[in-house]
Design a protein with these regions (language model features):
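Active-site pre-lysine segment of PLP-dependent enzymes
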Residues: 20, 37-48, 61-82, 86-117, ...
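PLP-dependent enzyme catalytic core of the Aspartate aminotransferase-like
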Residues: 69, 215-216, 226-268
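Short, conserved active-site loop motifs that form the nucleotide-linked donor/cofactor pocket
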Residues: 80, 107-108, 189, 219, ...
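PLP-dependent aminotransferase class I/II
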Residues: 16, 107-185, 190-191
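Conserved PLP-binding catalytic core of the aspartate aminotransferase-like
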Residues: 172-173, 177, 183-217
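PLP-dependent aminotransferase-like
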Residues: 1-55
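Short beta-strands and strand-loop turn motifs
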Residues: 26-30, 52-58, 82-86, 192-194
Length: 268
């Protein structure tokens, strides 16, 4: 009680959920409904009263990166801690990481995971970079045996061999650009630029389109239509060139079919 978490939705929802479990007040600073970019002035103002500000960068599911100038302003304004979750950070362009600010912002934490770029989602392993006193405080409340030895061994190999993953990440970046550009050309689809390994799109009857992608094409995408601020939005993960080509063709066909069906129904 008495603590405040500042959240920037639409974003990864678990932080707000666990804050509520801990009886922490959640203040939502909503993103622009058209661009999904943060309202910078409102965010800095809210940060002045915050115990913790959480920024996901690249943001899930919108894909935008928090500008370093904004992160610095939030750190300067916030009397508490500022957490930048960079779970998808390896897919962003070089120079986007908030790690560059750690030396000047002693209330900044940068969170990473091996679940995304390193394909170790099942290992449930990540790490945080922060000032020594912040790390000591986190260590004091860390669950006992929080990372088992098998996960530690797998994580060590992944980090030591990180260059082996670089070609895969580079291909995902290139395919992300191709996927975004192709989706943007489909009539009836809006796509947002992304620095993650996914692209967010909006189309009419998104939930039905998602079901038809699954049932008729065996293609799975994430339906965010239920989430506040994300009406009719789908998140499409970047796959192989062949998979991306298949989803582009399937989505174009289904969106056209749904539009024709809606027009036919209107004329009946």
């Amino acid at each position: 009680p008495g603590r405040t978490l500042v959240n920037v939705p639409p974003c990864f929802s678990e932080y707000a959920f666990f804050a509520s479990l801990a009886q922490t007040r959640v203040v939502d600073v909503w993103r622009d409904p058209e661009t999904f970019l943060p309202n910078e002035e409102a965010l800095v103002a809210a940060a002045r009263e915050a115990s913790l500000v959480v920024l996901t960068s690249p943001n899930n599911p919108t894909g935008d990166v928090a500008p370093l100038a904004l992160v610095r302003r939030v750190c300067e304004a916030c009397p508490g801690l500022v957490l930048v979750d960079e779970a998808y950070g390896e897919f962003a362009e070089e120079g986007a990481s908030a790690e560059a600010l750690l030396a000047e912002c002693d209330n900044l934490l940068v969170l990473h995971t091996l679940s995304k770029a390193f394909a170790l989602a099942g290992a449930r392993c990540g790490y945080v970079i922060a000032a020594p006193d912040v790390v000591d405080a986190l260590a004091a409340v860390r669950q006992i045996y929080s990372v088992n030895v098998l996960t530690q061994a797998a994580a060590l190999v992944a980090v030591e061999c990180r260059e082996e993953f670089s070609p895969v990440v580079a291909q995902i970046r290139a395919e992300r650009t191709r996927l975004f550009e192709a989706l943007s050309r489909i009539e009836g689809v809006r796509a947002w630029p992304s620095e993650g390994n996914f692209v967010l799109v909006r189309t009419a009857r998104a939930s039905r389109v998602r079901e038809r992608l699954r049932d008729e094409y065996s293609i799975l995408v994430r339906d965010f239509s239920y989430a506040p601020g994300l009406a009719d939005c789908l998140r499409i993960t970047v796959g192989t060139p062949e998979e991306n080509g298949a989803v582009i063709d399937a989505l174009a066909a289904l969106v056209a079919d749904e539009a024709a069906a809606e027009e036919g129904g209107a004329n009946d």
